[in-house]
Amino acid sequence: MYAVFQSGGKQHRVSEGQIVRLEKLEAATGDVVEFDQVLMVSDGNDVNIGAPFVSGGKVKAEVIDHGRGDKIKIVKFRRRKHSRRQQGHRQWFTEVKITGINS
């Protein structure tokens, strides 16, 4: 059984027991969070597609960890002008473990 849900402006395809990295959520480590913006649920034979969301569909997950991703570098370079601008960014994320899918 798997589901597609929306969180942080992104869509994620998950199944039970899977660990997923999402955009940062305001929840403490160990908390249980519910996602109700479920776009699709499938159990092998039946496929339930929402318009836009599946009614009664929920994905439950447990917050495992918060952290920051790898650093990316942003460089703006102007040729022949002796001008260069460099900036770095590390995005916050929340790691969750999917504990249940309801359709």
From Swiss-Prot:
- Any idea which GO molecular function terms this record carries? rRNA binding; structural constituent of ribosome
Q: Does the keyword RNA-binding apply?
A: yes
Q: Which UniProt keywords apply?
A: Ribonucleoprotein, Ribosomal protein, RNA-binding, rRNA-binding
Q: Which domain of life is it from?
A: Bacteria
Pfam families annotated for this entry? Answer: Ribosomal_L21p (PF00829)
Which Gene Ontology cellular component terms are annotated? Answer: cytoplasm; ribonucleoprotein complex; ribosome
Q: Which SUPFAM superfamilies match?
A: L21p-like (SSF141091)
GO biological-process terms attached to the record: translation
Entries under InterPro entries matching the protein: bL21-like (IPR028909), bL21-like_sf (IPR036164), Ribosomal_bL21 (IPR001787), Ribosomal_bL21_CS (IPR018258)
Task: Note the subunit structure.
Answer: Part of the 50S ribosomal subunit. Contacts protein L20.
- What family is this protein classified in? Belongs to the bacterial ribosomal protein bL21 family.
List, alphabetically, the PANTHER family matched.
50S RIBOSOMAL PROTEIN L21 (PTHR21349), LARGE RIBOSOMAL SUBUNIT PROTEIN BL21M (PTHR21349:SF0)
Main function: This protein binds to 23S rRNA in the presence of protein L20.
Tell me what this protein is called.
Large ribosomal subunit protein bL21
